C-alpha cells in the first residue's frame, strides 16, 4: 500500500472523525474537504479544493480503501474508510495502534512524547512507555508499518514515520541529501575562508609596499 499525500490526508481524516465525532461519520465531500484543510492538528496544512479531494477519494475507492454511502431519501454521498478494522479490511489495529497511525498520517513524523500528548482524543495512553511499546509492535511486524528516523540535533527523542504513504519514502531520501548538502556547504565555507584571508593579506602587503615606495620617493625629493 502506497498512498499519495492527498490520499493519506483523506484516510487520516476519516480515521480521526470516526473516533472523535462518530455522530457526523461518514463524511460528505464538503465535510471531508474541511477536515483535510484544518489549520490545527495537520502537517503540512493543505488548501485542497473539493475537486482535489474527490480525485483522492476516487483513487482510494479503486484501491478498495474507501466506500460510499447514501442515506435513504438523501442525494448526498458520504464516505467511510475501509483502511482497517472493518469486515473488508485485512488490516486490524488495536485502539492504541490506530491512534498512532492516524496521527502519523495527519501530522507526519513525531516523537513518542508528541504522539502521547496529541492522542488524547483518539486514545488515552497512560505514559510514553506505553506509546513506545505500541511503536515497537508496529515496527516488529513482518511488513513494518513504522520506521524510526535518525535522531536530529537538539532532539532528545527520535521521530517515527508511517510507511503507508509515498511521503515517508520521500522523507527518507530527502534527509540524507539535505545532510550531505549541509556538510558540503560547511566544507566549502571552511575552505573558502583561508583563501579569502590569504587574498586579503596579499592585497595589504602590496599596499604597504606601494606606500613604502612613495615614502622613500618623498624623502629623496626633500633631501
Swiss-Prot record:
SUPFAM superfamilies: Winged helix' DNA-binding domain. InterPro entries: DUF480 (IPR007432), WH-like_DNA-bd_sf (IPR036388), WH_DNA-bd_sf (IPR036390). Coiled coil: none annotated. Pfam families: DUF480. Belongs to the UPF0502 family. This is UPF0502 protein Sbal195_1802.
